[in-house]
A protein has these predicted regions:
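N-terminal amphipathic/basic leader segments beginning at the initiator methionine
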Residues: 1-22
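Mg2+-dependent prenyl diphosphate-binding active-site environment of isoprenoid biosynthetic enzymes
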Residues: 22, 26-152
Length: 152
């Protein structure tokens, strides 16, 4: 398979997984709408694709790595939502579309970003079961460091 084909296939895996992540979890539809608005807004998906390709290069199963790769994308999206807020960069557009806080309001945007950060760890805990508990915990700790004050 050529690299471009592999990249497209990985992106399709990520898109499909992200779209299915929050199905049936809609006690607050407005919050989930805001989360999905930014999560599915497009982009190159370079972070999850790099995670999947690293897994593949090390001889791992890409389907096992998919929840972890998508968790990384959730963290990235949360950071973009928060970065666009009026108290930060106050951006009106992201990828040619109105930013989350322009569509859903500042309070909902903050909650959507927070919820995506939390959802990243929930995704690892619920769907990362193909790994041993020890390895999933190590991956969670690594993501926590990268997403926290010692990382981003």
């Amino acid at each position: 398979m050529m690299y471009d084909d592999m990249l497209r296939a990985d992106c399709a895996l990520v898109e499909d997984y992200l779209q299915r992540c929050f199905v049936g979890r809609e006690p607050r539809a407005d919050l989930y709408d805001a989360m999905m608005y930014s999560l599915l807004a497009g982009g190159k998906r370079i972070r999850p694709v790099l995670a999947l390709e690293t897994c593949r290069m090390c001889g791992g199963d890409v389907t096992t790595a998919l929840p972890f790769a998508c968790a990384v994308e959730m963290v990235h999206t949360y950071s973009l939502i928060h970065d666009d807020l009026p108290c930060m960069d106050d951006d009106d557009l992201r990828r040619g579309q109105p930013t989350n806080h322009k569509v859903y309001g500042e309070a909902t945007a903050v909650l959507a970003g927070d919820a995506l950060l939390t959802a990243a760890f929930e995704t690892i805990a619920e769907h990362g079961t193909a790994l041993s508990a020890e390895r999933a915990l190590a991956a969670s700790a690594c993501l926590g460091r990268a997403a926290g004050a010692r990382g981003m």
